[in-house]
Every structure is written in structure tokens, then in C-alpha cells.
UniProtKB/Swiss-Prot annotation:
InterPro entries with a match to the protein in the record: APOBEC/CMP_deaminase_Zn-bd, CMP_dCMP_dom, Cyd/dCyd_deaminase_Zn-bd, Cyt/Deoxycyt_deaminase, Cyt_deam_dimer, Cytidine_deaminase-like, Cytidine_deaminase_bacteria
Co-factor binding details: Binds 1 zinc ion.
Enzyme Commission numbers on file: 3.5.4.5
Function description: This enzyme scavenges exogenous and endogenous cytidine and 2'-deoxycytidine for UMP synthesis.
Keyword entries, A-Z: Hydrolase, Metal-binding, Zinc
Protein name: Cytidine deaminase
GO cellular component terms, semicolon-separated: cytosol
Binding annotation for Zn(2+): 102, 129, 132
Amino acid sequence: MHPRFQTAFAQLADNLQSALEPILADKYFPALLTGEQVSSLKSATGLDEDALAFALLPLAAACARTPLSNFNVGAIARGVSGTWYFGANMEFIGATMQQTVHAEQSAISHAWLSGEKALAAITVNYTPCGHCRQFMNELNSGLDLRIHLPGREAHALRDYLPDAFGPKDLEIKTLLMDEQDHGYALTGDALSQAAIAAANRSHMPYSKSPSGVALECKDGRIFSGSYAENAAFNPTLPPLQGALILLNLKGYDYPDIQRAVLAENADAPLIQWDATSATLKALGCHSIDRVLLA
């Protein structure tokens, strides 16, 4: 079991501990539960889906990286496939506060970058901030997404974001988590190709500036993140954050990164290079390359 889970795991009910122990035994537990695993946990504990998600939130929050605030937020995004995806907030010392990742963004990106097609619900241990409510409004589940908070009745996103502004106001038809492929040729080594493939999946209807980041760890594992724009612009999630979300949730740490590649257009209206390289250097990675999409 990864050390970060030990304290939260010890506080779970005995029957949930017993059912989870073989799942968490792998140091690189992927921070997700398949539909089959969810069903097994429900049977072992007698909990319904909502109660189980709440019970698992401490494990999601244990994935938080909060050296600045020490305020850990956990989220679980429930995919329509039946898979549940953990997420947690992340802060980066030496970078800017704008690089921060919120727990809801983490769980949603985890689902999206894992190939999930849509979300049915999201469970969070603290009420979503306005930034996250706006981020969620970019999803193809839209204002119907169910939000579950401890001690409250579940409500749809529309209840948390009245008079919402979103992609439909800008006549955007393709939404976040819809399948997209921008068709750029995969060239170069495996890491470059992973970055280009991530750029091909970008959701960037506002700037038309595709980008993707791929991180290579010392053991050869590669984590890729795609750019995810938002109708309100500021809640946009850069591609580096997507890759860092996966790296963190899958049990790796920043010193594990040995090389990074950013893929983007040289003449795009928005450029990720400066922010990407600055944040990576703050995290200790100095082997950073840029490949141009063609």
C-alpha cells in the first residue's frame, strides 16, 4: 500500500478495510475503481453507491499535494462506464498560484484522460468553489451533473450554478469529454508521440491552440495531459496539469520525472511553453523539450 493511504485506511470501517486491502496492496494503485470493484465493495459493506463514495473520500483526499494550504480536498468522479476516478487538489511551491489544481478538476481530468466518455456524478468532501462549478459546466454532462456533498441532499450542477454561462452561450457544440482528434501526425520518439497524441485530444474551441504534455518517469512510465479550455477562460486546465494529475494519482512523485515534452503549434494564439517550462523547473525537472505540431 502506498504510504499516503495508511492513515485514512486505518480509519475506515473494518468491513471496508477488508474489502479494500487487496485493491490497495499495489504501491501503484491507480486511484480508480472499476465497476466490478465498486459492486464488490457494495456487496462487502452493504453500502449503497452514495454512501460508499462518501466512505472512500478520505482515500481520495490522501492524494492531495498541499504544501501551501495544508487543506486536502478529495473528489470521486463517477463515470457512466461504472468506473470511479479519484481526484485531489495540488499546489506547486515555486510556481504561481494560477498553476493550482482543484480536486474536482483532478477527478474530472483523471476520468477524461483515462478515456471515460461522460460523468454521472461527482462526490466531494467540501462544497465546490465557483471556479470548479464553472469548470464542470464545460462537461458534456452539463448542468445535469449530480453533485454529492457530505450531510446534504444531492443536487444537479444547475442548482449550484444558477443563470449559468457556458459553452452553449458561445455556440460551442463539442464539449469536454466528447471524443476529439485533431489529426496531427505522430512523429519522433515515444515521449514526443505521447505529447502529440495528447494534443490531438485537446478541448480548445475558443483559442484553437491545441497542446499536450508527456512526462517520462525514471522507470519508463509515461503520463500525458491534454489541454482543456473553458468558456470562462480562467478555469482552463493547462496540459501540464493534466499530466501531473495522472502522475500523482498513480503513485509517482515529482522527482520521478526525468524528461518532459510539450507539443503545440508555434504560431498558435496561446503558447504553453513558458508556463510549462517554469512550472516543471520549479518541480525539479530541467530536461524539457518542445515539439511542433504538423
